Amino acid sequence: MSRRFAEYESLDLSRVNEEVLADWMQHRLFEESLKSREGAPSFVFYEGPPSANGMPGIHHVMARAIKDTICRYKTMKGFRVDRKAGWDTHGLPVELGVEKSLGITKEDIGKSISVEEYNAACRRDVMKFTKEWEDLTHKMGYWVDMEHPYITYDNRYIETLWWLLAELYKKGLLYKGYTIQPYSPAAGTGLSTHELNQPGCYRDVKDTTCVAQFKIMDPKPEMQLHGDAFFLAWTTTPWTLPSNTALCVGPEIEYLAVQTFNPYNGIPITVVLGKPLLHTLFNPKGECEEIPASYDPAQKLLPYKVIASWKGKELEGMRYEQLIPWVNPGEGAFRVITGDFVTTEDGTGIVHIAPTFGADDDRVAKKSGVPPLMLRDKEGNMRPMVDLAGRYFPTTDLDPVFVEKHMDLPLYDVYAGRYVKNAYDAGKTEKDETLDVELCVMLKMQNRVFRIEKMTHNYPHCWRTDKPVLYYPLDSWFIRTTACKEEMIANNGKIYWKPESTGTGRFGKWLENLQDWNLSRSRYWGTPLPIWRTEDGSEEICIGSVEELYNEIEKAVKAGMMERNPWAGFKPGVYTEENYAKIDLHRPFVDGITLCSPSGQPMRRELDLIDVWFDSGAMPYAQMHYPFENRERVEDGSVFPADFIAEGVDQTRGWFFTLHAIATMISGTSSFKVVVSNGLVLDKKGNKMSKRLGNAVDPFETIKKYGSDPLRWYMITNSSPWDNLKFDTDGVEEVRRKFFGTLYNTYQFFALYANLDGFTGEEESIPFAKRPEIDRWILSELNTLIREVDDQLSDYEPTRAGRAISDFVSENLSNWYVRLSRRRFWAGDMTEDKLSAYQTLYTSLLTVSKLMAPISPFYADRLYRDLTGKDESVHLALFPRPDQSQVDRALEQSMQMAQQISSMVLALRRRVNLKVRQPLATLMIPAIDDEQRRCIESVQPLILSEVNVKELRFVDDSMGILVKRIKPDFKRLGPRYGKVMKALAEAVTAMTQEEIRSLEKAGTFRMEVAGTPVELELADVEIVSEDIPGWLVANEGNLTVALDITVTDELRSEGLARELVNRVQNIRKQSGFEVSDKVDVLLLSNDIMDKVVAEHHDYIAQQIQAESLEISDAVSDGVELDFDDFVLSIQVVKHQG
């Protein structure tokens, strides 16, 4: 049976992308791949849900390429790999986008726009870019079920979330507490600690800081000898100073009383600060035995005298004057307390305590009975001085009675309504003067500040608004994750992390310092907290299902708490989409439900939503509507836990953590076994991509220009997935050209000659043992490659797998096997040798198409179908298995030796600009042992042919013909032998020729340097050989080659003959001649070339397929060829005969 292999004019991977994708879509190939594995063992994969309210970026291609590679690989290994897409539809990203598009703020919700209208807008907006996401998913070849995705706003999804929360409630892991929490005024909600620890949340900012002077009311005698006495306390947040109610010292820290002057006004003062920090505020040159009577602030050197010292515990209980007396906090304030958290790393060793704005402050104040400074608003609620918008409470929002009784209104009114950070004030920019500056200036005028300076420090920002957070007292619901901390740590030890350092480092340390999870969010669009409480909080219920809530509503109707059941048309226990579409579990619908407590009191829902990260972390359960549906599948291990997940490193304390935490608390296990944490995709200069900076890369344009395969191959093979990728389209182009171009050209070569010779791929196979050595070598390498790629992909190392394939295709298959076998394909008849060459190349290409399929699915499929001639996709095929009987390690090593030696010799040729077509006389190699010599001898003819050298001579190193020098690698040896490195370097460079030979032969060498045992490895040094006259020498590892570069007249003549052949072959190609066409060649007589043709006539004629090769005194219509020393006119025409 005859068949033709498809041939192409050029490689257009973008077109291949489109054509193969169209075929997949038409034949629903993804679905077919699942059907083909029906009944096979399952490989469980979880897709992290992106939000479709924003466009996908190039970094999404990276994460999805990793996921798709592993899932395709596992499918080819015989597993059924279900991949369910998901959409993250709740939370701040959506709400902030809607607020921006509607031109409103959070404060407008419920006023100018109803909660129902607002949430309806959120529901519409959240799926705005679904088509773009689906388009990118298809175009990049990511196989995932987008027709049946899990959607976090779906009522059935929310029902599972409620069930999970009810389970946590039953276990005593859900509680309400009033604590200091991270709070985002810009977003209007509290944040969890894992949200605050997203990459980039902590940023260096330049703020005004000050060392404030707190006047001591009961100074010790030593403090009364030089002006008023003050405690010095440093703060990076001067806006918190009006809320100060205590100063905290370390009980065992030593504190000094120092006589000095205020550096701004020269007023004599005595200050108290920690001894270790004395010289951060005072120049040692200013210390004096007697303090002068006065000081001029114009002088740079501030005089000071240390007069006494005490332990911090001896200062406990001392009282001081309120620094900024706007509000009277009541009894127990303005005294010194002790705390173990106080350090002397910076500041003054005395910490200013504002209990309403710091967790440590709140804890130590409560322990010492120090009250927080609170205001009472018009509703009668006690509030901190800063409101939820991030500003000092406007006086109009406060209880007039409280203002009159407890506040100094004239002083407070100057700053009332001022935002504590310019970022919260729409009318201010970063350049405007901040509240901190104004407060510091005020204190300076009052002799209440010792130092004011700008300082860069690390400050937390909201992960979604990019604006600073505050630490703020909030009434929130928490998950008691700390109760399961040890179990989470133990479960983490069972997870296979790629890289391991993320699991033991970033993730492991996070678990070790775990804090309870702040679940509450004061927002509108999200999963409502399913807790109903009485007004006094004495009775409450945590609802765990829609059916339970339905029944509780029925009870409330009977008790007269509600007029009717708003879910009257809903049928409990019927889990269809149509039934659940009759209800809405979002606000404001659930807010209007009032339940009846066991004692007959009304219970209303706690208005908070839950953290959106709980939504995504619950997806292993919620995507299955567990436990209401699919209970058996979840509990028997069919769909839980995941065998594999992968997302960006930014999810380490996000999705990875919430998946792990929820599963540990609910099921006692982690929800995933293997996780690949990929790095960031940066621009080519290493900067973060952003539309604002104009350095973002459009994934759609990139795929359109290059095709998905080069993009995916570049991303996978450029660096390990967990390393940051400096994305450069030049790299994508290089992959397209070098890897795909080489593979395409190899296939084109095969198809061209296979079609000429009628090879079909169905001929009886030549037995492996009967095939020539070159065939057995490439098949051995191919089977070694299969094992390597299989091992690497099974170990979640796609980078190593891809690089191994690239190396095989470019170096072994194309540059070595095909090049060395070309003449076999050109031979006339279909001999056994020629058939073996075809079958070997066919097998190699077919196997490569399968190996590369997980990484580059489009071209692999095209190549596979072109080779097989069948309509079946490579993605339905099984992954290749190595045939160990065809693996010959000795043959591989010999050929590798030939490749290495050839590469070294060709590099020497390039050094002196000697073309390979120019024959040379001698190559000299000092073999380090008999085994290396035998290895080289087995491929000696091949080496000589490759490098175009007439003779290979082996020499003994001990003959002294080649002299070697050795240098230490400081980067490798320094960390191991730092203390003796200088002496070691001298010892290495002084090694004898015999010692160098010993190192090359054994791979290691032991010596003792300055009493320290040293073991050198070959990689620890650089060995170079000195050139000898007329020769060039090169070293690589334990291999040395020396090349005789003398060109005799005889050698030059042969070189010119080869050069002429090459030039004529180029003319044949440019003239469009077929491979089989004969030609007539006429050369213009030339002294040099006449002699060359005479000496090598038969060789030249055979190589260029010349029917006639003649020299003439005149050549018409010829081509001029430049041979450096002369120009030759030549005429090449197709033979007419």
From Swiss-Prot:
Does the keyword section mention rRNA-binding?
no
- Positions annotated to bind ATP: K691
Q: Which UniProt keywords apply?
A: Aminoacyl-tRNA synthetase, ATP-binding, Cytoplasm, Ligase, Metal-binding, Nucleotide-binding, Protein biosynthesis, Zinc
Q: Which InterPro entries match?
A: aa-tRNA-synth_Ia, Anticodon_Ile_ABEc, Ile-tRNA-ligase, Ile-tRNA-ligase_type2, M/V/L/I-tRNA-synth_anticd-bd, Rossmann-like_a/b/a_fold, tRNAsynth_Ia_anticodon-bd, Val/Leu/Ile-tRNA-synth_edit
Motif 'KMSKS' region: which ranges?
688-692
What EC number(s) is this enzyme filed under?
6.1.1.5
Gene Ontology molecular functions:
aminoacyl-tRNA deacylase activity; ATP binding; isoleucine-tRNA ligase activity; tRNA binding; zinc ion binding
Name the chemical reaction catalysed here: tRNA(Ile) + L-isoleucine + ATP = L-isoleucyl-tRNA(Ile) + AMP + diphosphate
Q: Identify the residue span(s) of motif 'HIGH' region.
A: 50-60
Its required cofactor(s), as named, are: Zn(2+)
Q: What are the annotated GO cellular component locations?
A: cytoplasm
Q: What does this protein do?
A: Catalyzes the attachment of isoleucine to tRNA(Ile). As IleRS can inadvertently accommodate and process structurally similar amino acids such as valine, to avoid such errors it has two additional distinct tRNA(Ile)-dependent editing activities. One activity is designated as 'pretransfer' editing and involves the hydrolysis of activated Val-AMP. The other activity is designated 'posttransfer' editing and involves deacylation of mischarged Val-tRNA(Ile).
Domain comment (free text): IleRS has two distinct active sites: one for aminoacylation and one for editing. The misactivated valine is translocated from the active site to the editing site, which sterically excludes the correctly activated isoleucine. The single editing site contains two valyl binding pockets, one specific for each substrate (Val-AMP or Val-tRNA(Ile)).
> What protein family does this chain belong to?
Belongs to the class-I aminoacyl-tRNA synthetase family. IleS type 2 subfamily.
User: What is this protein identified as?
Assistant: Isoleucine--tRNA ligase
Q: Which organism is it from?
A: Porphyromonas gingivalis (strain ATCC BAA-308 / W83)
Its ancestry begins with: Bacteria, Pseudomonadati, Bacteroidota, Bacteroidia, Bacteroidales
Per the record, the gene is ileS
